[in-house]
UniProtKB/Swiss-Prot annotation:
Residues that bind ATP: A10, Y11, S12, G13, G14, L15, D16, T17, S18, A37, G120
Coarse class of the protein's main subcellular location: cytoplasm
Alphabetical keyword list: Amino-acid biosynthesis, Arginine biosynthesis, ATP-binding, Cytoplasm, Ligase, Nucleotide-binding
Organism: Polynucleobacter asymbioticus (strain DSM 18221 / CIP 109841 / QLW-P1DMWA-1) (Polynucleobacter necessarius subsp. asymbioticus)
Protein residues bound to L-aspartate: T122, N126, D127
Name of the protein: Argininosuccinate synthase
Family: Belongs to the argininosuccinate synthase family. Type 1 subfamily.
GO terms (BP aspect): argininosuccinate metabolic process; L-arginine biosynthetic process; urea cycle
Residues binding L-citrulline, per UniProt: Y90, S95, N126, R130, S182, S191, E267, Y279
EC number(s) per entry: 6.3.4.5
InterPro entries: Arginosuc_syn_C (IPR048268), Arginosuc_syn_N (IPR048267), Arginosuc_synth (IPR001518), Arginosuc_synth_CS (IPR018223), Arginosuc_synth_type_1_subfam (IPR023434), AS_cat/multimer_dom_body (IPR024074), Rossmann-like_a/b/a_fold (IPR014729)
Pathway annotation from the record: Amino-acid biosynthesis; L-arginine biosynthesis; L-arginine from L-ornithine and carbamoyl phosphate: step 2/3
Subcellular location: Cytoplasm
Reactions catalysed, as given in the entry: L-citrulline + L-aspartate + ATP = 2-(N(omega)-L-arginino)succinate + AMP + diphosphate + H(+)
């Protein structure tokens, strides 16, 4: 790919992507465009602009974009309409951010006339797959540079040596060994990987967690909140309307102080290995519980069961980087159709790491108290009808048992 003229780099301004920027300049000799996404990671992003300028990047080739609203509105909320969980635990905070970054990189490539894109994902992880499947889905002819699959800088020490050799500033934390974890954050979650977490038998240190208090140290009194949903998406907390990204940030704040959303798991990566990660997803944990609560009274039984059947497949598509694939888009159409009547208010109790639904109400409720009551229903439900229903559903099992007995007599 030596004929590359211009490349758009997903650039955080940190050590890894700063080394990549210099390496791209030296290895490919091409013009570089940097793109830094604000997904609510809580970091000051303007230093990335200053660092890019130090590398000689033209001011017009430096993009720092606030994507928080688009991220939550067009990616997080659609995913939560499906009650998406990967392997029974993971709420996909990293996975769902990658398709948006890839989308914006391709948009910038078109805007600037770039013929290539580049990312800082390693050759061992899922992110390389997520980024590149997105690139190719949105721009089939794009060229992709994945430095971690090309260079020999395969350790933190080699990265630092390269940085010092080329005058790339190395923060003191890296010189002293840095944070013991590889972290990734956005409005949905913060993740921790690496170092002693690579031993699945080692307990995560309490000092690692950044967004949530220890459940043991959370308030001794529970907090009750209300979340209003409209067409499957949350729109208000305690009667106050929020924009999507503001609502998720507020749920993170509320959940964090009650120790909600901590997770320590071993997951199966798409590339084949098992990986241990720790996550904090306070707002997402509350949102998932609330959404299932409002669906419990607004969704038809078979529709709800169908959604539950399809959800693991939908989750795997997102985890594996197939957000832009036709099968994910088809599933999204179905999921969104099911959400038309998912409107109403859910009340939840937050207490020392737990979140519980305590009430739910909707103008579209399918819960009929007159039928469900244990008291006299005035003939709304004829209990005698249940006998025939049971016999018909037992018919196939009765036939099977009768046939088994006949075989045993031969």
């Amino acid at each position: 790919m030596s004929d590359i003229k211009k490349a758009v780099l997903a650039y955080s301004g940190g050590l890894d992507t700063s080394v990549i920027l210099k390496w791209l300049q030296d290895t490919y000799g091409c013009e570089i465009v940097t793109f830094t996404a604000d997904l609510g990671q809580g970091e000051e992003l303007e230093p990335a602009r200053a660092k890019a300028l130090q590398f000689g990047i033209k001011p017009e080739n430096i993009f720092i974009d606030d994507l928080r609203e688009e991220f939550v509105r067009d990616f997080v909320f659609p995913m939560f309409r499906a009650n998406t969980i990967y392997e029974g635990e993971y709420l996909l905070g990293t996975s769902i951010a990658r398709p948006l970054i890839a989308k914006r990189q391709i948009e910038i490539a078109r805007l600037t006339g770039a013929d290539a894109v580049s990312h800082g994902a390693t050759g061992k992880g899922n992110d390389q797959v997520r980024f590149e499947l997105g690139y190719y889905a949105l721009e089939p002819g794009i060229k992709v540079i994945a430095p971690w699959r090309e260079w020999d800088l395969l350790s933190r020490e080699k990265l630092m040596a390269y940085a010092e050799k080329h005058g790339i500033p190395v923060e003191m934390k890296h010189k002293q060994g840095g944070s013991p974890y590889s972290m990734d954050a956005n409005l949905l979650h913060i993740s921790y990987e690496g170092r002693h977490l690579e031993n699945p038998n080692a307990e995560a240190e309490e000092s690692m967690w950044r967004w949530t208090v220890s459940p043991e140290k959370a308030p001794d009194a529970p907090e009750i909140i209300e979340i209003e949903f409209r067409a499957g998406d949350p729109v208000a907390i305690d009667g106050k309307a929020y924009k999507p990204h503001e609502l998720l940030a507020e749920l993170n704040r509320i959940g964090g102080k009650h120790g909600i959303g901590r997770l320590d798991l071993v997951e199966n990566r798409f590339v084949g290995m098992k990986s241990r990660g720790c996550y904090e997803t306070p707002g997402g944990t509350i949102l998932l519980k609330a959404h299932r609560g409002i669906e419990s009274i607004t969704l038809d039984r078979e529709v709800a069961h169908l959604k539950d059947d399809l959800m693991p497949r939908y989750a795997s598509l997102i985890y594996n980087g197939l957000w832009w694939a036709p099968e994910r888009l088809a599933l999204q159409t179905l999921i969104d159709h099911t959400q038309q009547a998912v409107n109403g208010v859910v009340r939840l109790k937050l207490y020392k790491g737990s979140v519980s639904v305590i009430s739910r109400d909707s103008a579209n409720t399918l819960f009929d108290q007159n039928i469900a009551t244990f008291d006299d229903d005035g003939g709304a439900y004829n209990q005698a009808d249940a006998g025939g229903f049971i016999k018909l559903n037992a018919l196939r099992m009765r036939i099977a048992e009768t046939a088994k007995r006949k075989r045993a007599q031969k």
